[in-house]
Amino acid sequence: MFSLKTLPFLLLLHVQISKAFPVSSKEKNTKTVQDYLEKFYQLPSNQYQSTRKNGTNVIVEKLKEMQRFFGLNVTGKPNEETLDMMKKPRCGVPDSGGFMLTPGNPKWERTNLTYRIRNYTPQLSEAEVERAIKDAFELWSVASPLIFTRISQGEADINIAFYQRDHGDNSPFDGPNGILAHAFQPGQGIGGDAHFDAEETWTNTSANYNLFLVAAHEFGHSLGLAHSSDPGALMYPNYAFRETSNYSLPQDDIDGIQAIYGLSSNPIQPTGPSTPKPCDPSLTFDAITTLRGEILFFKDRYFWRRHPQLQRVEMNFISLFWPSLPTGIQAAYEDFDRDLIFLFKGNQYWALSGYDILQGYPKDISNYGFPSSVQAIDAAVFYRSKTYFFVNDQFWRYDNQRQFMEPGYPKSISGAFPGIESKVDAVFQQEHFFHVFSGPRYYAFDLIAQRVTRVARGNKWLNCRYG
C-alpha cells in the first residue's frame, strides 16, 4: 500500500503513463518508475510535492536526468523506451555520469589490498567462483598500481558474499532478474564490500548472469568508481554479456581507475577498446543489413538498430543478442525471399531467422561458389533474388533461386556502379537504391538511373546532423 503522502506523486505518474499504456498496466508502471527513481536517482521516498517553489516539476526533472544518462530521448515522460530501460537487470548502485568517481572521491590509501570470499553460490563450484573473482580483480590490477591478495581468514579490505533479499545493509535484493549485485565505496567496515544476489542464476558462460563480468563491475565500485554513461564501459549500470575470453578493460574504465590511483606499474601502459561514438565524423561501419524493416549497423563489438517507426537509434553489444557470434562482422544481407539474414566474418557465415541463429551454422563461404582465393567478404546486398558480394574492387553475383554463382563474374565495381570508386565497406538496399558505404561516406546509387544521386556522411543514418 502507498501512503497518502505519495498520492500526488502517483497521480502525476498516472497522468503521464496513461497516454501510452492501457489501464491494466498503469499501476505496475507507476510503481516501476517510483521505485527506480528512488533507488537510482535520489528521489525521496516521501516526495509528495509535485512541483518546487520555482515551478519546476521534481518527477519530470528526475526522469530527464535518467533519460540523459542512458542517451534516451529527453522528454521527462515515462514512455515505452524509458520503461524498457528501467526493467533491465542492473547493478544496485545509484547512477551519476561520465566515468565519474564516487561522490567525495573516496579511495584506498594503499595499493596492496586484500579480499575474502565469505560464502559461495551453489550454481558454480568453489573453484569456479574463486577463478571468476581472481580474474575480475586482475582486470583492475593490470590497469593500475593496485595488487589484490586473497585471504581465507581474518579481516579483509574487500569482503565478497552472496545474500538474498534483506541482508542488513539497507540495500535489500529484489529476487531474480532485477538488481544483480551492489558494492560499497572504499572505507572502513562495510566499505569496499561487494554483495551478490543469491537468487540470481550465476554462470561462467553467456547464459543468465556471468559472475566474472558482474564481479569486475562491482569491484570498480569497491575501488571508488561510479557508474559510467558509456554503454561500452564495464561500469555501465545495466548488465550485458560480452565475450569473456581475452576480455580487456575498456578505455573508459582504464581512464577512470587511473584518475584515482595513477598509471599501471607495468612497463607498457594498457589500452582498451573504446566505444564508437555515433556522430564521430570519421565513423565507418563494418557491415549493414535490413531486418524486417529495421536497419542494423555493425561496428566492432556493437551494432546500432534503427527502428522503422521510431526516431531513436539503439546501440547494443553483438554478444547481447548473439552470444555465439564473433565480433567484427564484415558483411551482412537480408534475403527477402526466405525471410533470413546472413552474417559473414572471414570465410564463415551464419543464417538467422529474425534474431535466432539457425542450426548447422557457421558454414564456409565456398558453399556460394567462391574460388579459394576469396577468404572474406567486404559487403553484401540482396536485390531481386540475387545477392551481390563485394570483394576489394570487384563484385560477384549469386543466383539465390538456382543456387549458383552467375558466370561472367567477378566484375569491376566502378564499371557497374559509376561513381563508386572506392572499396565498399557496407551496403543495403531500399526500394530502387543501393546505399553504399565507403569510409565515412555513403552513396545513394539509383538502380534505375544507374548513377549516384546523393553523397553524405554515413552516420546520417544514426540521426547525426552536420551544418
UniProtKB/Swiss-Prot annotation:
Cannot be activated without removal of the activation peptide. It catalyses: Cleavage of interstitial collagens in the triple helical domain. Unlike EC 3.4.24.7, this enzyme cleaves type III collagen more slowly than type I. Binds 3 Ca(2+) ions per subunit. Binds 2 Zn(2+) ions per subunit. It is found in: Cytoplasmic granule; Secreted, Extracellular space, Extracellular matrix. Its EC number is 3.4.24.34. Residues 1-20 form the signal peptide. Its cofactor is Ca(2+); Zn(2+). Ca(2+) 3 binds at D286, D378, D425. Ca(2+) 1 binds at D157, G189, G191, D193. Neutrophils. Residues 21-100 form a propeptide. Its main location: cytoplasm. Zn(2+) 2 binds at C91, H217, H221, H227. Glycans are attached at N54, N73, N112, N204, N246. GO terms for cellular component: collagen-containing extracellular matrix; extracellular region; extracellular space; specific granule lumen; tertiary granule lumen. It comes from the Eukaryota. Belongs to the peptidase M10A family. Can degrade fibrillar type I, II, and III collagens. This is Neutrophil collagenase. The lineage of its organism: Eukaryota, Metazoa, Chordata, Craniata, Vertebrata.
